[in-house]
Amino acid sequence: GFAHKAKCLHNAALFRVRNAFTAHNKTALTANEKEVQGELALLKGQKSYYVPGYGILQRLMRITNNPDFFSGLPMQTAQHVIRQVCTDFKGWLASLKKYRKDPSGYTGKPKMPGYCRNDTASYLFTNQDAVIYDGKLKLPRIKIRIPVRRRHGRLMEVKVKPVSGGYELLLVYQVKDASVQSGKHAAAVDFGVDNTMAVVSDTGKSILFKGRFIKSVNQYFMKKKAERISLMSKGKETTERVWSKYLDRLSAYRTSYIRDCFHKMSRKL
């Protein structure tokens, strides 16, 4: 699927950025560095690139007819994957520069961005590939239409994140700047466990959000997690971490449930 293709393209782009960076000012190059330098030599103009930017990297993918770049991802999706790789690498270089000036602000030396070891990676669709029609989201090459709530704004992009055997969609809209009006009244919010939120205001109105639903799902999660880990840990070293797809799904359920509760509470508030 797209998530696997995005992962392959991410690693292919990062491979070229990393090896171009490590080959800089070196005489004895590794086989990987020689391969990347050979590809860069195909580009007319400057022969050496310290850190290939988005424009250089995209040209490199096209001129070499890179199979991961032309694997079937929508073109703007593939371009975003490459752009994100360049952004992450430049962010690492900026952090490294700050670390060398003042290491006290870091717990350790920033590590170079690593390859994606999972079988899938996050990606996005722009509004040229993802559209909302008749209250349903249409994504490329997917027959299922996903119902979405109508928003007052223009859909800009859809971010797709693989989560526990499924996918989490984040829809980004462009809306007009809302004017914030400062009112004459005030309210206070107190967060707790038994009562998730207690809200009072100077208008005399108050609202109380019970926390038993969140406590209940959290207790259920901890109970099932302990049972499964105990079962999986039999005959193994106690220091060895055990995990499974079932625990992934269980964790995702707990997270989604609690997130949904807070969204509903904030909406009512």
Which residue ranges define each predicted feature?
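Nucleic-acid substrate recognition interfaces
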Residues: 1-269
